[in-house]
C-alpha cells in the first residue's frame, strides 16, 4: 500500500512538474511575442503615423464616431451592425479617442501576436523561439508594412479569417474534444468578427478556411468516428450560429423601408461603379431619355455627384447598372471573357512583376511543405497526403478564387494581397504541423528509430533551408517595400496639406454649410490618431456611397438642409466647394436644365502661401 501511494505521489509530482514547465514555456512565448509586436508597433509609430487607406474607412469612422450626423451611429453601411454598434457605443462613452482606428490596429497586432505565440509552441529552446519570432517579424515587416501603416478594413477582415484558420490547423489533435473546443474559441470569435467587419472578404476567403478544416479533420485516426464528427461538428455549428446571428441582427437593424430602399440603391451603385462602365450619353441617348435623364443628369453619374438630383433614386440606379452590364456582355462574349480571365490568371501567377515577390513567397511555401511531407513519409505514412491531395486541394481552391476576382474585373491590392496573406499563413500552419505530426509517431523498432533520426535530421535541414530562403526573400523585398511605404506616406503628407486647409476653412465658418465635389476630395486621407475631431462636420459630399442613405438624411437635417438641390439654390448659408483644377460647368448646365436662373459664383478661395487649392461657390441669391 505504501509503495502504491509513493508511486501515485511521484506520478502526481511528474504531472505538476510538466504543467509548470508548460506554463513557463507559455509565459516565455507570450513575452517574446509581446516584445515582437511592441518593436513593430514602436517602429511604425516613430517612423510613420497611421493613416486610413481609403475614403471608405474615413466615412465609416465619421458615421460611427458621430462627426457625420452629430451622434455616434451603428449604421455605418459597410460593416455589419453588431460590431459597428459596439464601436459607436464606445464613442458615446468617450468621444475624444479614435476608437475605430484603434480597433483595427489592435486586430492587426493581435493576429500577429496569436500567430507568433502558437508558432513558438512547436519548439522548446528559447533561442529557437526567438528565431521563429524574428523570422515572422521580418516577414510581417517586409510584406505587410503598407497594410499596417495604411489601415483598411477589408485587409483586417482577411487577416482575422486567416489567423483563425492558422489557429484551427495548428491545434493539437491529441487534445480531448472539450480541450479542442476550448483551444478554438478564439478561432471561432475571429471568424465571426471577420464576418462582421467585412462579410464579403470573409466569404471570399472562406473556401480556403474550409480547406483548412477538411485537412485538419482528415488528420484524425478515425475520420468518421462519432467523436471526430462531434469534434468538428461543434466547431462548424458554432461558426454558422455566429454568422447567422450576426447577419440576423444586421438585417433587423437595417429592416426599415428607408434602409431597404437605400440598400437596393447601394447594391446597384456598387455594380455600376465597381464592376461596370458608365454608358456615355451621346452613344446611349435613347436609353437615358427612356428613363427620364438628360445629359446634365448623366454627367452626375460620371462625376459621382448624383446626390444633388433627387430624381436619381434606387430604380434609376438599377436601370443604369443593368444597362451597363448588358452592354458589357455584348462587347465581350462569355467564352471570350473566360479565356481572357484564365490568361490573366497565369500572367499574374508567373509574369506579373508587381506581384513577383508574393508569388515567390507562396511557391517557396508550397515546395517546402511538399518536400517535408515526402521526407516525413518514412516515419508517418499518411504525411504524403500533403503531396497527394492537400496541397493540390489548396492550390485549386486559391486558383478558383483568383479566377473569380479576375473574371469580375476588379483586383485591388487590398483584395489580392489579402488572398496572398491567407494562403501563406495556411501554408505556414502546414509547415509547423508537419513537425508535430512526425513527432506523434510511436517508434516501434530500432530500425524505425534509426530511420526516424536520419529523417528528422534531413527535415531539420529542410526547415533551415526554407527559413534561410524566406529570410532572404524578405530581406530582398524589405528595402523596396520600406521605400514604397515611405513614398506613399510622403505623398499623402504633401497632398493632405490641401485637405487640412479645407477642413480648417470649414471649421472656421461653422455657421455655414458646404457641399464638396466628390472627386475633389478622393485624393485625401486622414491620420488615425492625430487631429482627431469627432464633432459634427459642417460639410457633406455631393455624392458617394453613403449618399441618399438614412444617415445622409440625418446629416442634412443636422445641418438644417432639406435636400442638396434646395439647399444650394435657396439657402444663403449653403455653398459648393470644388478643387481649383476641376471645372464647374457640370453644375452650371445642371442648374440651367432644371430651370434655375442662378449660376455658380466664386466667392472665396482656399489655400496658403499664394497657392489656391479649392474654390468656394455660391448659387443661392
Annotate each PLM feature.
Residues 37-77, 87-92:
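Extracytoplasmic loop-helix module adjacent to an early transmembrane segment
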Residues 254-343, 534-551:
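Membrane-proximal stem/loop segments at transmembrane-domain junctions that anchor or position
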Residues 182-199, 210, 235-245:
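Membrane-interface alpha helices of multi-pass inner-membrane proteins
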Residues 475, 499-583:
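Short periplasmic/luminal acceptor-recognition loop of GT-C membrane glycosyltransferases, typified by
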Residues 106-126, 370-378:
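Transmembrane-helix motifs of polytopic, lipid-linked glycan transferases
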Residues 1-43, 217, 227-239:
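Start-transfer (signal-anchor) and selected internal transmembrane alpha helices
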Residues 130, 184, 230-241, 425, ...:
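Signature aromatic-anchored transmembrane alpha helix within multi-pass, membrane-resident enzymes
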Residues 73-107:
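Short hydrophobic/aromatic helix or loop-helix immediately within or flanking a transmembrane segment
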Amino acid at each position: 500500500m505504501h509503495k502504491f501511494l509513493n508511486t501515485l505521489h511521484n506520478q502526481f509530482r511528474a504531472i505538476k512538474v510538466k504543467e509548470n514547465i508548460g506554463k513557463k514555456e507559455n509565459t516565455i512565448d507570450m513575452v517574446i511575442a509581446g516584445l515582437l509586436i511592441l518593436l513593430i508597433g514602436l517602429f511604425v509609430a516613430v517612423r510613420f503615423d497611421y493613416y486610413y487607406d481609403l475614403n471608405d474607412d474615413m466615412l465609416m469612422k465619421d458615421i460611427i464616431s458621430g462627426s457625420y450626423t452629430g451622434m455616434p451611429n451603428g449604421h455605418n453601411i459597410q460593416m455589419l451592425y453588431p460590431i459597428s454598434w459596439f464601436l459607436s457605443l464606445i464613442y458615446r462613452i468617450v468621444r475624444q479617442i479614435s476608437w475605430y482606428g484603434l480597433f483595427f490596429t489592435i486586430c492587426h497586432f493581435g493576429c500577429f501576436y496569436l500567430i507568433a505565440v502558437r508558432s513558438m509552441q512547436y519548439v522548446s529552446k528559447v533561442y529557437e523561439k526567438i528565431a521563429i519570432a524574428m523570422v515572422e517579424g521580418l516577414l510581417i515587416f517586409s510584406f505587410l508594412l503598407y497594410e499596417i501603416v495604411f489601415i483598411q478594413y477589408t485587409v483586417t477582415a482577411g487577416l482575422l479569417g486567416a489567423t483563425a484558420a492558422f489557429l484551427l490547423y495548428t491545434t493539437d489533435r491529441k487534445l480531448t474534444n472539450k480541450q479542442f473546443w476550448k483551444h478554438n474559441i478564439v478561432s471561432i470569435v475571429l471568424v465571426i468578427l471577420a464576418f462582421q467587419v467585412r462579410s464579403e472578404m470573409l466569404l471570399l476567403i472562406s473556401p480556403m478556411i474550409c480547406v483548412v478544416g477538411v485537412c485538419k479533420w482528415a488528420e484524425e485516426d478515425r475520420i468518421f468516428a462519432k467523436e471526430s464528427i462531434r469534434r468538428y461538428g461543434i466547431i462548424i455549428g458554432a461558426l454558422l450560429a455566429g454568422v447567422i446571428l450576426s447577419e440576423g441582427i444586421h438585417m433587423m437593424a437595417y429592416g426599415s423601408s428607408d434602409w431597404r430602399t437605400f440598400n437596393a440603391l447601394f447594391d446597384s451603385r456598387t455594380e455600376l461603379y465597381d464592376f461596370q462602365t458608365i454608358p456615355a450619353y451621346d452613344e446611349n441617348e435613347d436609353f437615358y431619355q427612356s428613363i427620364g435623364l438628360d445629359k446634365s443628369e448623366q454627367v452626375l453619374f460620371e462625376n459621382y455627384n448624383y446626390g444633388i438630383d433627387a430624381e436619381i433614386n434606387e430604380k434609376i440606379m438599377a436601370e443604369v447598372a443593368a444597362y451597363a452590364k448588358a452592354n458589357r456582355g455584348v462587347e465581350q462574349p462569355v467564352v471570350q471573357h473566360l479565356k481572357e480571365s484564365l490568361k490573366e490568371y497565369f500572367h499574374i501567377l508567373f509574369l506579373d512583376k508587381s506581384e513577383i515577390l508574393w508569388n515567390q513567397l507562396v511557391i517557396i511555401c508550397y515546395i517546402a511543405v511538399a518536400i517535408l511531407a515526402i521526407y516525413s513519409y518514412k516515419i508517418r505514412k499518411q504525411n504524403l497526403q500533403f503531396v497527394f491531395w492537400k496541397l493540390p486541394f489548396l492550390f485549386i481552391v486559391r486558383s478558383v478564387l483568383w479566377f473569380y476576382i479576375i473574371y469580375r474585373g476588379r483586383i485591388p491590392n487590398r483584395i489580392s494581397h489579402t488572398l496572398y496573406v491567407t494562403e501563406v499563413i495556411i501554408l505556414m500552419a502546414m509547415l509547423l504541423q508537419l513537425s508535430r505530426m512526425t513527432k506523434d509517431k510511436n517508434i516501434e523498432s530500432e530500425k524505425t528509430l534509426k530511420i526516424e533520426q536520419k529523417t528528422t535530421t534531413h527535415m531539420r535541414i529542410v526547415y533551415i533551408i526554407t527559413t534561410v530562403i524566406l529570410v532572404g526573400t524578405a530581406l530582398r523585398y524589405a528595402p523596396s517595400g520600406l521605400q514604397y511605404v515611405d513614398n506613399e506616406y510622403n505623398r499623402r503628407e504633401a497632398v493632405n496639406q490641401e485637405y487640412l486647409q479645407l477642413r480648417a476653412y470649414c471649421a472656421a465658418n461653422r455657421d455655414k454649410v458646404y457641399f464638396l465635389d466628390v472627386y475633389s476630395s478622393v485624393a485625401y486621407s486622414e491620420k488615425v490618431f492625430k487631429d482627431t475631431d469627432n464633432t459634427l462636420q459642417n460639410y457633406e459630399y455631393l455624392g458617394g456611397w453613403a449618399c441618399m442613405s438614412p444617415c445622409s438624411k440625418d446629416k442634412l437635417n443636422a445641418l438644417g438642409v432639406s435636400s442638396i438641390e434646395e439647399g444650394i439654390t435657396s439657402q444663403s448659408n449653403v455653398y459648393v466647394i470644388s478643387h481649383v483644377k476641376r471645372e464647374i460647368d457640370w453644375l452650371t448646365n445642371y442648374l440651367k436644365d432644371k430651370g434655375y436662373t442662378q449660376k455658380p459664383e466664386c466667392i472665396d478661395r482656399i489655400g496658403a502661401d499664394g497657392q489656391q487649392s479649392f474654390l468656394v461657390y455660391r448659387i443661392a441669391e
